[in-house]
Design a protein with these regions (language model features):
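Anion-binding (especially nucleotide phosphate/pyrophosphate-binding) glycine-rich loop
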Residues: 1-149
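Beta-rich strand-turn-strand
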Residues: 107, 306-309
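Phosphate/pyrophosphate- and phosphate-bearing ligand-binding catalytic cores of soluble enzymes
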Residues: 4, 10-17, 54, 152-299, ...
Length: 335
């Protein structure tokens, strides 16, 4: 395994912002990972996957680890029924290629998460979700290395502390995910859960798992920019949770506010709606703007400086705060 000094990270974040890593390496096994941790015990560490949910505003003064640990295997569990299928997938496998693998074999549970960029290892960190599904619903176990002790530890689903775009791995930043064990089903029945997807499938009486994947891909491609053409990180902000009273105040002026009741009396609303009504749909300042088809996505039209993105982000946050008294929280990681 080689180490690189002052390594350019532009190709390791989907916003394509420039930054140098003091040290960079790509371990291909857990043994190589242990070696790089042992070789640089006192360096600050950052583990990155596909770089689809982060960007850089400055150089990283430490060790950047971009693992290349791949592999997939089916595992058996005598206590489970024949309906169940378990797959252990290593962290560096491409997420959408894995979803395609499952759909081709009729393994149900991931089809709504089609075309999400990134790696398998990033999925539980962010608890990725789309079209009424979250990855936490199909994760049985996460195998990780504790970066402080170099020990391999396993987390059952309930130990991962999954939340909305959140997990113990995201909050603590002290674990390197080695693999994820998924619990899927061998049979599939479509359950309507999301308006756009339901509408896309309305002419199909009994959608197959492949029909659902194809529909998700079509909807995403219409709404979302290709990061290879227009650098972006997908949804930039989390959808906010507000009180019922707060929602009612907004609805008095904006009757079409999306409002989804949640446990504890809160209401989940749409960050895209708020950004749109605050005047930032399709808005561009210099080389940074929101995507015209989806204001939740910030796109980079040509800046190499991550601070340009931060300034634009802060403008949106202030506009939404002024109009709705809601503070938008970034979904992406900013370094």
């Amino acid at each position: 395994m080689d180490y690189y000094r002052q390594y350019q990270l532009k190709n390791y974040n989907s916003f394509k912002t420039e930054a140098l890593a003091k040290i960079f390496c790509q371990p291909k096994s857990t043994d190589e990972l242990r070696k790089c941790l042992a070789d640089y015990p006192n360096e600050k560490k950052l583990i990155i996957g596909g770089g689809c949910n982060l960007f850089f505003t400055k150089d990283f003064d430490g060790l950047v680890i971009c693992p290349d640990i791949k592999g997939l295997r089916e595992i058996s569990d005598e206590e489970e029924e024949d309906e169940d299928i378990f797959l252990e997938v290593n962290a560096s496998e491409n997420w959408d290629e894995f979803v395609d693998y499952c759909v081709e074999r009729g393994f149900a549970g991931l089809e709504n998460l089609s075309l999400i960029p990134g790696t398998v290892g990033a999925a539980p960190i962010q608890n990725i979700g789309a079209y009424g599904a979250e990855v936490k619903d199909v994760i049985r176990e996460v195998v990780a290395m504790d970066l402080e002790t170099n020990e391999v530890v396993s987390f059952a689903n309930n130990e991962c502390e999954f939340g909305y775009r959140d997990s113990i791995f995201k909050r603590t930043c002290k674990y390197f995910i080695i693999s994820v064990i998924f619990h899927l089903k061998r049979t599939f029945v479509y359950t309507p859960r999301y308006f756009d997807l339901n509408k896309e499938l309305e002419d199909i009486e009994e959608p197959s798992i492949q029909d659902v994947r194809n529909a998700v891909i079509r909807v995403r491609q219409r709404k979302l920019p290709d990061e290879k053409v227009l650098p972006n990180t997908g949804s930039f902000f989390k959808n906010p949770y507000i009180t019922r009273d707060h929602a009612d105040l907004i609805i008095a002026e904006y009757p079409d506010l999306p409002a989804y009741p949640q446990k504890g009396g809160l209401v989940k609303t749409s960050a895209a709606f708020l950004i749109d009504k605050a005047g930032y749909k399709g808005k561009r300042i210099g080389n940074i703007g929101t995507y015209p088809n989806q204001p939740l996505i910030i796109v980079n039209y040509g800046s190499a400086n991550g601070k340009d993105i931060v300034r634009f982000m802060q403008e949106i946050q202030q506009a939404v705060k002024d109009e709705f008294n809601i503070e938008l929280e970034p979904e992406v990681r900013i370094y």
